[in-house]
């Protein structure tokens, strides 16, 4: 599990096996294999290092 932070400050644990796509637009958007999108504070590089 990786810990990320939503823009409102809420901490969230995500199963890294569910990550399909990580985009910076300029916010970092995580797209899960379920189709759900989550906007987080961490950069694309931070997510890459966590996975």
Kindly label every feature range from the protein language model.
Residues 2-6:
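A short beta-strand micro-motif
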Residues 7-12, 20-51:
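Acidic, Ser/Thr- and proline-rich intrinsically disordered linker/docking segments
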